[in-house]
Amino acid sequence: QVGSAEEINLPDRSIDVIAVAQALHWFDLDRALPEMARVLRSDGVVAAVWNQRDASIPWVAKLERLLGRQDSDFDPQGFIEADERLHLVGAQEFRHWQVLDRDQLAQFVNSRSEIVVLPPAARAERVNAVLALYDEYDRGGGLRMPWISRCFRVRLRLADAVEPATDVPDDDGTLLIDFK
């Protein structure tokens, strides 16, 4: 089913978790939060995740300069804590690596919003600069992109939240996400 955060095509009180990656700050929260509250069960949570590249690695620091800074000034926890409708229940940070070959790095760069909006010649110049960086640092087997995933468990606090449905759908046992 297709929907948006502002129009979730699910029954009232039908889900336990809403997972949002890299996007909560882009939603129209005045519309999205009541809609999330409508579909979440009374003990449901929003799982919000933001991924950031770890620029403490030299080649990644150079990549950051070539791409333009990522949302490094954006503080997801501060964003959550600043909104009285959001209650931070828990936070956890995870580090992981992604191995990228030359083509995958080019695809990654071409998918970045700050690159997509460039005129074609400027985009090609930027991609070529990143590929030169790849060639400088690759020792065979690809480059390891270090990521920091910041994960937050959030409960909604809305005064005008939808009252629990009296006809809560039966739990059919379907597990949509397995975090094990």
Segments from the language model and where they lie:
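Conserved residues in the N-terminal Rossmann fold of short-chain dehydrogenase/reductase
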Residues: 2
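A short acidic, Gly/Pro-enriched loop at the edge of an enzyme's catalytic core
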Residues: 6-18
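Short glycine-/acidic-enriched loop or helix-start segments at secondary-structure transitions
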Residues: 11, 29-30, 57-58, 163-164
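A short SAM/SAH-binding and catalytic strip from SAM-dependent methyltransferases
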Residues: 16-30
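Short, flexible active-site-adjacent loop segments at beta-strand->alpha-helix junctions, enriched
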Residues: 24, 52-54, 158
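Conserved catalytic/acceptor-binding region of the Class I
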Residues: 31-100
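Conserved Class I S-adenosyl-L-methionine
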Residues: 78-180
